Each structure stands twice: as C-alpha cells, then as structure tokens.
A protein has these predicted regions:
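Aromatic-residue-lined binding/catalytic grooves and analogous aromatic/hydrophobic interfacial grooves
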Residues: 1-457, 475-477, 495
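Active-site neighborhood of glycoside hydrolase catalytic domains
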Residues: 462-496
C-alpha cells in the first residue's frame, strides 16, 4: 500500500492546512483532515461554491467582455508593420484587456466541522502511539492514538458512489466517545506568510440542529448562489442538540456523514443556476447513506476508487521504509529514493481522482484541485487556461484515468457560449444567435464563462488558449478511441 504517514498533528494555521492536513475528495467535494488530539477539525469544500458571475435574473452578463475592442487591431498591426513597437504595446495594454472587478469572483471555502472530545486531554504529550496517515491505495485518512489505556481511531474518506464525506470514530478500551460537534461556515486559520486573518464577508448562512444532524444553509452575498450542507450522525451513544451543537456521550462508535451542494448548473442560458431544493437534497443523500452500515459505505468507496487507481502500477525497485513521509522527504537520495518516487507518482494520480470525477454539472480540477481553506485563495483558485488547466490533465490519459477528464471536456464546451462574445468583441468575428462561428478564451476563467482577457495585457492576453486546451480535449479520443464521443462532443468543439 502507498501511505503518507506522520507522527504529529497538523498545525492550526494556513501553512498547516496547506502542507500538513491530509486531503480526501470525491471530485465534487473535498476535505482536509487535521488529525488533532482531543479535538478535530475537518475543513471542507464543494467545487461550485463561487462568488462573482451573473445574478440569477441577469439579462446583460457577457462573460466580462468589453465591447468593440477588435477595432484597435488594425492600428496595432499598422504600428508593428512600421516598426513602432512602443505604440503597438501601448495600444494593446490599453485595449486588449478585460475588467478587474468583483464579477470575476473567487472559489470559496464551504465550511468546517469541529469536534471537541470532552473526556480527552489535548496535546501530543498526553498520548502514545500517535499516527496520522493517508492510505492512497484506498483513499482513506486515518488518525489514531492511545490515551489513558484507550485507543481512539478516526477514519475519513469522501465517497463518489454514495456522494458523502464520511468520518468514522471508534475506540478500543474503557473510555467512551464523548464529544461536542458543530458545522460552521469557514472559520479563520491562524495567520502566517501572505495570509493574514481571513474574515470572510462573502457568505451568509444559518445553522439548525436536531438529534439527527446539523443543517447549514446560506447564500453567497454578491451573486445569490445558494448552498447547503448537512452533517448527519449515526451512533450508539446519546445525542443531544442545542444551539447549533450536537453532544454525543457514552458512545463506542459514531459515523458522521456530510453532504454539500449548491444550486450551480453548468448552463449559461440559466445564468448557471438550477431549481433545486437544497435542504431536501443534502438530507436525502445523507439519509440514504445512513441506511447503510459503515463497512458497506467503506467497501463501496474502496471498490469505486480502486477501479481507477489500481489500473497503473509503478515499481522502481525501492525498498519499503519505516520513515515518516516528512523524514523521507528530508533524507531523499536520488540514487536510493525509488520508493518515495513511486509514492509521489501515485499521489498525483490520487489527487486527480479525488478532485475530478464525471458527474452532472461537475467542474474540472481548479488551481487547487478541489481544496481551499480561505475565501481569498491565491489567483482566486480559478482556471488558468494558459498552462495550468492543461497541466492538471496531462497525466490523465497516459495514467489510464480518462474518465477524470470528462468534467474538463464539458467545462471547455460550456466556455464556447461566452467565448463567441469574446471572439466578436476582441477579434471582430460575429456569431449570430445559435450560430457556431468561432470562440475565444484567455488566461483566466471561472465557472461562469469568463472569456475576456485578463486585466493586465502582460499576462492576460492569451488568444491561443482555446486551441491549446483542445489538445487536452482531443486526447480523450486519442486514448479511448470513442468515435461516438468524438462525433457528438469533441468534433463540434474542434470545428468551431
């Protein structure tokens, strides 16, 4: 088995979240597990939770494109022909750009699950046999330790077939599981580096609880996008609900089941919205999962995940090591580090499977896959079409994970709608209603068809980005030889 394993909990900072917390995901949802002692924090995401884009009832959204910018192209060409490069540069910098405003948006963190174990002491000094790990052969994160003669264990995974993120708590020994649990909007991480305290003002929501679980419902303030998550619980202990908190006492086990959704739809004609009863949807998903025992959920997850992961094996002849992953990285020797290289290779496959699966309205892996702890992520955690989205999917086909690329293909197909406006306004190529007559994208993109150039010409003008992305799209056919998919999906994109 391929394992990441550590002998210390995650630091409660952005740096800790980024470099230490362990990621799980089912393509749509992602979570980072901190692996704490006497408490736990699981920060989670849902890939369609974004600010920016059109309002639900918008009639004038156009993908950020300014009007009539193509009219300067002839003047730029003339300046270049005359050798007046400075004039051409100035014209391009003034005209071949897009807006820098809130409508661009950013990928938002969804929320945090917190647990405080009322009969446990915090801190590494109060436990023995501490282990925090991620088995990437089964896509399960584990935290375990022994305190006062009782071993406590937590397993977390994000299931694609059951569409829930699951955390199972168990114990061996005399002590029971007694803990307080809550589910909140994103809470701030301790500042470090470039990330000061992140007081999020992008979302508003409310929490309601009963003995079955915790419901979080809200909206993104600037665009009205609706979201909801439901955290259900299944346990042999006593559960009480009060003021947004659940308290569990006297349990030998507890299974937490999380579902998170938004009303985003990959459909520009509906302003990227769909009519959905979010509360009923997330509760129904959790209740369906709750009807299954933990081992069934776990086995469903492993079987689905391994149907993709087990297709490729890499044996470089390395020797198995008892080192923690941190120690292995610090002592890496290119002549003897084959086992770490195997792990690194398979970890990349794990991350793609976990952040990109085919599902209705699914988005591709963004700059951070599906994982984001703050509401001001680097580069908005968006979709960069000048190399980064291509890079996400370069390994997909040659590593026998073609299915993970379908969300990327659908996303690029969707970009054509506002890409036709970009072609009209920046290249003078007119597309009448419904006519497939050419499309254009640039460096940055969002789930909302943002096709205009970036707000700085130096990095934002990238008119070949769609052609480059289409290489990734066409690779799906080259590796699968699916002629029906080529004819119905890929070829119309290529032709236009």
């Amino acid at each position: 088995n391929y394992q990441l394993h550590y002998d210390q909990p995650t630091a409660p900072s952005y740096d800790g979240w980024e470099k230490q917390a362990l990621p799980v995901g089912n393509g749509e949802m992602g979570a980072k597990v901190f692996g704490l002692i006497g408490e736990e924090r699981i920060q989670y995401n849902e890939k369609t939770l974004w600010s920016g884009g059109p309002q639900p009832d918008s009639t004038d959204y156009n993908g950020g494109n300014y009007q009539d910018r193509y009219k300067v192209l002839a003047e730029i060409r003339k300046a270049l022909e005359e050798g007046n490069h400075q004039k051409a540069k100035q014209l391009a910098e003034r005209n071949l750009v897009g807006p820098n405003n809130a409508q661009y948006g950013r990928y938002l963190s969804f929320g945090d699950i917190f647990m405080v174990f009322n009969n446990q002491k915090k801190g590494l000094e109060n436990v023995t046999d501490y282990h925090r790990g991620l088995d990437i052969s089964e896509a399960i994160s584990t935290t375990s330790y022994t305190q006062d003669g009782t071993n406590f264990k937590r397993e977390t995974f994000s299931s694609y077939p059951d569409d829930v993120t699951v955390t199972h708590l168990s114990k061996k020994g005399d002590k029971t599981l007694d803990f307080t649990l809550w589910n909140s909007l994103t809470e701030d991480l301790i500042a470090n580096g470039d990330y000061s305290w992140e007081y999020s003002n992008y979302k508003q929501g409310a929490v309601t609880t009963d003995s079955n679980g915790i419901l979080l419902k809200g909206t993104v303030k600037d665009n009205g996008l609706k979201f909801a998550s439901y955290l259900g619980i299944k346990t042999d202990g006593q559960v009480t609900a009060q003021d947004g908190y659940l308290t569990v006492t006297g349990a030998s086990y507890a299974t937490l089941l999380l579902s998170a959704k938004t009303n985003f739809a990959q459909n520009p004609k509906t302003n990227y919205r769909k009519d959905i009863d979010l509360e009923n949807t997330v509760k129904s998903i959790v209740e369906a999962a709750k009807a299954k025992d933990y081992e069934t959920l776990k086995n469903n997850h492993i079987k689905d995940y391994q149907s993709l992961f087990n297709r490729v094996q890499l044996n470089l002849g390395g020797n198995k090591s008892s080192q923690t992953t941190k120690e292995a990285l610090h002592t890496y020797n290119p002549e003897k580090g084959q086992k770490l290289e195997e792990l690194f290779f398979q970890y990349g496959r794990y991350l793609l499977i976990s952040s990109s699966r085919d599902r209705t309205d699914a988005l591709p892996a963004n700059l951070q896959g599906v994982w984001n702890a703050v509401d001001n992520p680097p580069w908005n955690s968006d979709y960069h079409l000048n190399v980064n989205l291509q890079m996400n999917y370069w390994p997909a086909y040659m590593n026998n994970l073609a299915e993970t690329a379908k969300s990327m293909v659908n996303y690029i197909d969707d970009m054509r709608y506002y890409g036709r406006i970009a072609a009209k306004e920046y290249a003078g190529i007119e597309s009448k209603e419904g006519q497939e007559n050419g499309w254009l994208v640039h460096t940055q993109a969002t789930p909302f068809g943002w096709t205009t150039p970036g707000w700085n010409y130096y990095w934002g003008w990238s008119p070949a980005a769609n052609a480059w992305m289409m290489q990734n799209v066409y690779d799906y056919y080259k590796f699968t030889k699916d002629e029906t998919y080529l004819k119905e999906k890929i070829y119309p994109m290529l032709k236009e």
